[in-house]
């Protein structure tokens, strides 16, 4: 530990703590960063003592420089730390890591005598105009050469498929990553997809269908002269029966070039669009705003579904103008209708910015509470018809009994006598509905007795009614006799043998038994 601390001593250690990790940042370098750099040097087979001098730091930078473009984050951090330590040994005052890297870069260029510059780690730049950059086919010395796709491009494509799972973003992402690719490179991208093999099979079927259509539209011409390049077939465009050199020659031959890469990309885009519809079954007609959903979130979902729809631009424009307002919730729809005909999206987002949020809900609740607490206005005619308040204690109008200053009336309020209350007053007259309200007469009165000598106007009773009642009584008696138990009948028979008189109806029961069993029974 002591040897590692001896890398920077005294003034150099103080200067190290003044250097910022990032431009305009708050964090600064500490001795722990030097200790970490010494530990990392062991991984590269470099001695820790190299950090103690300016020449040693230069040797470290020469070793690390070729590894920086493709190195890990730890390697880049080690390179930055060594640059700062080199500046401290060279007594160069720097404010942050970026300045230290620039100074170290200038020194290495001057020492090697070349005009090459170290790659900028934190700020990657775009390739100069006129050069291929990341394109698989590049021109060198008048000839077209093939450069394989970088692992970074393939990794970006695989991450796009895994994260979006064939969402609407996959199609434009594939277009951007496969720009300028040959069928060989595009097949590499498709082969890197491990999951979602069902979607890959759909894409293969689309490729086979498009290749068959290409062969039908471009028949094979007659025999070609020796050495002449043949025209591509559907399988050649798909990259199964053609080589990379043939694909490049078809793409850049003069005259009559055939862009096999763009044709193959178009076929795969058709397959990807079908996969997008399969993995996103939500129809744009079903995208509706929830009662508590913000209008901005609803617009995002609407345009995401609209992006997955593979329809004509005119149809998409109609969907935007019609369905966007039609499927909004009632609160936003009320606001949008007040904007007039064909409002812009910016106007709609601005108008519905607070609709559906907590502030709008609180405002509506406050208005509803205010309306509930506000008394309803009484019409003038109804106010004129309302009777004045009358005091039941003194009988005057204009105040109630609670506000009356007169002495409280004693005794019964009905008759004025003491010893009972109005509820028990004998002078009150009540019907079956009780006493009348507020000392008034009851709502019904006992029926008065009819005066003597009046002749009823109802017709006399019909004699057939009496005859019907008589028949009903006889039938009732017969049913009772039939329902008598056998025990009672035998008791009546014993009474007859003993000379006693049985109850009524017993003789008839015995006659029935004689008719069944005869006289000997």
UniProtKB/Swiss-Prot annotation:
The record marks 135-136, 365-366, 382-383, 431-432, 445-446 as: Cleavage. A motif (Nuclear localization signal) lies at residues 26-32. Late-budding domains (L domains) are short sequence motifs essential for viral particle budding. They recruit proteins of the host ESCRT machinery (Endosomal Sorting Complex Required for Transport) or ESCRT-associated proteins. p6-gag contains one L domains: a PTAP/PSAP motif, which interacts with the UEV domain of TSG101. Residues 73-77 are annotated as: Interaction with membrane phosphatidylinositol 4,5-bisphosphate. This is Gag polyprotein. Gag-Pol polyprotein: Specific enzymatic cleavages by the viral protease yield mature proteins. Residues 7-31 are annotated as: Interaction with Gp41. Residues 191-228 are annotated as: Interaction with host PPIA/CYPA and NUP153. This isolate is from a Gambian case of 'neuro-AIDS'. Belongs to the primate lentivirus group gag polyprotein family. Residues 12-19 are annotated as: Interaction with host AP3D1. A zinc finger (CCHC-type) spans 389-406, 410-427. A motif (Nuclear export signal) lies at residues 16-22. It comes from Human immunodeficiency virus type 2 subtype A (isolate D194) (HIV-2). A motif (PTAP/PSAP motif) lies at residues 456-459. Residues 279-365 are annotated as: Dimerization/Multimerization of capsid protein p24. GO terms for biological process: viral budding via host ESCRT complex; viral translational frameshifting.
């Amino acid at each position: 530990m002591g040897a590692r601390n001896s890398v920077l001593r005294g003034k150099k250690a103080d200067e190290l703590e003044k250097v910022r990790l990032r431009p305009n940042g708050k964090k600064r370098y500490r001795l722990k960063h030097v200790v970490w750099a010494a530990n990392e040097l062991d991984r590269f087979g470099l001695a820790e003592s190299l950090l103690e001098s300016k020449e040693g730091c230069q040797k470290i930078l020469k070793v690390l420089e070729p590894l920086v473009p493709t190195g890990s984050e730890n390697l880049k951090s080690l390179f930055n730390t060594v640059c700062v330590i080199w500046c401290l040994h060279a007594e160069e005052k720097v404010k942050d890591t970026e300045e230290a890297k620039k100074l170290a870069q200038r020194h290495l260029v001057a020492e090697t005598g070349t005009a090459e510059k170290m790659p900028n780690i934190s700020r990657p730049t775009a390739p100069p105009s006129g050069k291929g950059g990341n394109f698989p086919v590049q021109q060198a010395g008048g000839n077209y050469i093939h450069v394989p796709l970088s692992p970074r491009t393939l990794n970006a494509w695989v991450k796009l498929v895994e994260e979006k799972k064939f969402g609407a973003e996959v199609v434009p992402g594939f277009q951007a990553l496969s720009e300028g690719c040959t069928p060989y490179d595009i097949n590499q991208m498709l082969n890197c997809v491990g999951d979602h093999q069902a979607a890959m099979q759909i894409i293969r079927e689309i490729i086979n269908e498009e290749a068959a259509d290409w062969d039908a539209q471009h028949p094979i011409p007659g025999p070609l002269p020796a050495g002449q390049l043949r025209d591509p077939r559907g399988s050649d465009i798909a990259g199964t029966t053609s080589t990379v050199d043939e694909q490049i020659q078809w793409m850049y031959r003069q005259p009559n070039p055939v862009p096999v890469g763009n044709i193959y990309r178009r076929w795969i885009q058709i397959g990807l669009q079908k996969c997008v519809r399969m993995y996103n079954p939500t129809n744009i007609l079903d995208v509706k705003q929830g009662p508590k959903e913000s209008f901005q979130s609803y617009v995002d979902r609407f345009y995401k579904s609209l992006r997955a729809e593979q329809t004509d631009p005119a149809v998409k424009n109609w969907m935007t103008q019609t369905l966007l307002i039609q499927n909004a919730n009632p609160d936003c729809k009320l606001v949008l209708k007040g904007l007039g005909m064909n409002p812009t999206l910016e106007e709609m987002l601005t108008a519905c910015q607070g609709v559906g949020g907590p502030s709008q809900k609180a405002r509506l609740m406050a208005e509803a509470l205010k309306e509930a607490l506000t008394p309803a206005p009484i019409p003038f005619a109804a106010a004129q018809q309302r009777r004045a308040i009358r005091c039941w204690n003194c009988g005057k109008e204009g105040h109630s009994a609670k506000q009356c200053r007169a002495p409280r009336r004693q005794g019964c309020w009905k008759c004025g006598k003491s010893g009972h209350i109005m509820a028990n007053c004998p002078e009150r007259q009540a019907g079956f509905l009780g006493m009348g309200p507020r000392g008034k007469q009851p709502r019904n009165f006992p029926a008065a007795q009819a005066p003597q000598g009046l002749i009823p106007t109802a017709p006399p009773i019909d004699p057939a009614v009496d005859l019907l009642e008589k028949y009903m009584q006889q039938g009732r008696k017969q049913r009772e006799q039939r329902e008598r138990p056998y025990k009672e009948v035998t008791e009546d028979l014993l009474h007859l043998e003993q000379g006693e008189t049985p109850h009524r109806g017993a003789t008839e029961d015995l006659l029935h038994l004689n008719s069944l069993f005869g006289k000997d029974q």
